[in-house]
Amino acid sequence: MTLAYRKIAVVGAGAWGTALAQVAASAGREVVLWAREDELVQNVNTAHENSLFLPGIALHKSIRATGDLAEAAEADALLMVTPAQHMRGVLEQLAPRIAEGKPVVLCAKGVEQSTHLLLTEVLAEAAPQAAAAVLSGPSFAAEVARGLPTAVTLACEDETVAEALTHAIGITTFRPYYSSDLIGAELGGAVKNVLAIACGIVEGKKFGDSARAALTTRGFAELTRLGLAMGARTETLMGLSGLGDLILTCNSPKSRNMSLGMALGEGKTLEEVMGARNSVSEGVHSATAVVALARKHGIEMPIAEAVARIVTGAAKVDDAVAALLSRPFRSET
């Protein structure tokens, strides 16, 4: 293993994992893409396409898919793109084969629902010998895979590793900015998914652009309060993985979390929306965990709490909205 990170394994062949494999291949790396589905492995290796999760985009012929986690573990660095709620199980399978100090880059955005742990904390329990890193920022998989310009944050406590990873996967159209603030980079992505559901509800209810702007801004205040309480840096929360990701996710129906919120605002049930999808909306699973973190740190997050009540069935959309709008007037800061 060297800091050149010549061989990259992408663990998880959904849309985002496939897009990151495309980026790493474009950067000249040897890329192994792990998928659960045998038919998807065959699809990538023979047709050079991910017809299931990223159809219509031609993949680099150098990307090699595998269903063998042990093979993926042999890479110089691992990009973990499995859904947040399944991350622990995959990491535990990989752990015996992860060498001391090998970078494991967490690319999913969420908080473990059952434990309320950040994914870096999950990694510390499952594979403590790994060098934890986080990749997060305003990015849609299809745009990244097509080579449209995108910038993200890549954080690792060892900034030398973060910089080396940036050079390993960075290309002209995919620009990672490195940082040593793991908590800030990770928390922004997890919380914005919850807030995006709220913004989608605003859109679905046709409350207007002013209401969505207000909710996005007040939501960012919630994210910032929690982030600072947990040790994140202000500049990280104001950066790509925080404010940047929030702006994108709360303003585009292409966001899975915002589109889910829109459907809820239009009157659909959560079961109806989730049943019609083959992709994951992490905000649904992270909402209760984010609220638990806020309570643990004594932070008020009324928007996140409203989303948590909606997705758990504790409140109807209209009742949760009414409760937010009837909160007492207060100072902005």
Curated annotation (Swiss-Prot):
PROSITE patterns named among the record's database cross-references: NAD_G3PDH (PS00957)
One GO term of the biological process aspect: glycerol-3-phosphate catabolic process
Record-listed E.C. numbers: 1.1.1.94
Single GO molecular function: NAD binding
Binding site for sn-glycerol 3-phosphate: K109, G137, S139, K192, D245, S255, R256, N257
Residues that hold NADPH according to the record: W16, R36, K109, A141, R256, V280, E282
Catalysis performed (reactions): sn-glycerol 3-phosphate + NAD(+) = dihydroxyacetone phosphate + NADH + H(+); sn-glycerol 3-phosphate + NADP(+) = dihydroxyacetone phosphate + NADPH + H(+)
Alphabetic keyword roster: Cytoplasm, Lipid biosynthesis, Lipid metabolism, NAD, NADP, Nucleotide-binding, Oxidoreductase, Phospholipid biosynthesis, Phospholipid metabolism
Top-level EC class: oxidoreductase
Primary localization: cytoplasm
Biological or metabolic pathway of the protein: Membrane lipid metabolism; glycerophospholipid metabolism
This protein's GO CC annotations: cytosol
Cited PANTHER family: GLYCEROL-3-PHOSPHATE DEHYDROGENASE, GLYCEROL-3-PHOSPHATE DEHYDROGENASE [NAD(+)] 2, CHLOROPLASTIC
Membership in a protein family: Belongs to the NAD-dependent glycerol-3-phosphate dehydrogenase family.
Free-text function comment from the UniProt entry: Catalyzes the reduction of the glycolytic intermediate dihydroxyacetone phosphate (DHAP) to sn-glycerol 3-phosphate (G3P), the key precursor for phospholipid synthesis.
HAMAP family according to UniProt: NAD_Glyc3P_dehydrog
Name of the molecule in the record: Glycerol-3-phosphate dehydrogenase [NAD(P)+]
Gene name linked to the record: gpsA
